[in-house]
Amino acid sequence: MSIDQIILGNIYTLDRKVEAICVKDGIIQYVGSKRVAQELIDENTEILDFGDNFIYPGFMDGHAHGLPAGNILGFSIDLLDGETLEDYVEITRKYIEENPGRKIYCGNNWVCGNERPTAAMLDEVSRDVPIALTTLDGHSIWLNTAAMEKFGIDEKLLEKYSANEVHIGEDGKPTGYLSEEPAITLNSKIVKSDEELQESLLIWQEYAFSQGITAAFDAHVGYFGYPSLKAYADVSKSGKLKLRTYAVRTVKDTDDVLELVELASKVNNEYFKITGVKVFIDGVVEAHTAWLLDEYGDQPGYFGVKSFSDHDKLVEFAKLANEHNMNVHCHTVGDGAVKFALDALCEAQIATGNMDQRNAFAHLQVVTPEDIKRMSEYNVIAVVPPLWTPREKPYGKKEMEYLGPDRDEDSYPIKSFLDEGAKITFHSDYPVSPIMSMPQSIYAAVKRTHTLEECEPRNLKESIGVMDALKAMTINTAYQFGQEDNLGSLEIGKIANMVVYDVDFLNDDIEKIPDAELISTIVDGEVVYRNI
């Protein structure tokens, strides 16, 4: 048997430790001892010897936004270093001065404090060229007057949305600050050229490989409208897409579901697959828009925003998706959102008899014990964010105020899902969350904090072990993607995706993990990233 690559090192397959892996045509042919592997070498075999370093199955992200990530990295105003609205205005002003001539300027990663932004503030930078700045959590957007005019943001929107979504001034008119559905919808209307989106996708792929990500879930492939999907289709067709991507797109009615089914039949391939539909059930706690069962701590009688609350329609989505071998991926932050979505999906799964549809709920900040148990019973996958578990700036104080101390301390269960037998996968939500670090995710899952900035552990009783954390980034994520026979562990017959680090995650001191250095990322048996 001719072998293309032999990979040597301290290799964790997921269920055992070996010395060598042999690869042919991107598929693992042998897993075992170095001695036996070397017998398969010929003059054409590439030897990848990683010495004393440690090799793991390729890591995968259960919920990210790849195309926006690449677009932000390559084409956007980064507001992360600002702290006040004045800072964001000045950063925007400087960027536009250094990058003149664009038809629209987009920015990301600002944080809304107690002071609400207005279009007038951004008009100081430009009254004529549209400016659209999306918050760090991706759930709100700040526009100047030119952008409001371009996208039709006026009093008519108040007939459809509440003042918690289209914020208004004392005159009753929109101020230029939008949250939840109108903000997310507007982002999809910002037109990017095909060339910019394709380049953005390749920038994202390069970044993902540099973080040890070998496959990812794109949690809303319609972020920039239809051109987003076209970019994935074009880049994968060209052979340049090597980051296997499994995607959903937000739907609002059954026609959207059927359209996505038709699109999937045309564009799905080895490296890009539409696997289901997405539904935004609620918002986020820090924006005061998560749907809670009990009222907000700072506002009696207020339970958050119900971004989607049509039970029968969600049942129909799930049934229709099931007919076409698809699943439903729900944005669920609050316990009200979880209960609503779970009621609908359980009803649909009982009707179809399919308990293996692999529906998933992402984020899961506040969840009742009863619904954790139900998620396990109905095999709804818990896509959880370990890096969000600590209490940190800038949102920690807000979350405590909005949830109250008890709900805040119980935020982001992980161990409870495992205890009930549910499948968990990890997500970064990058770039909605600006951190993508697999070692930090492992550390946060164990310690309920991270070392990237000053923060304190929260809900320590939900800590899990390192092996469970590794599974949540490998074999469990493969299961979420419906790819557990191809990805997620290093076994004969599986795709040769793996990552190499200088730390033994399973045996070294836990405090070494955050500083683990990625040595190499391997996809289809070939090195796609090398830390030189």
Model-derived regions: residue spans:
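Generic beta-strand/beta-sheet core signal
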Residues: 31, 134, 218-219, 246-250, ...
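Phosphate/diphosphate-binding loops
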Residues: 240-278, 358-366, 397-423
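Short, charged, surface-exposed secondary-structure boundary motifs
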Residues: 142-143, 256-258, 392-396, 436, ...
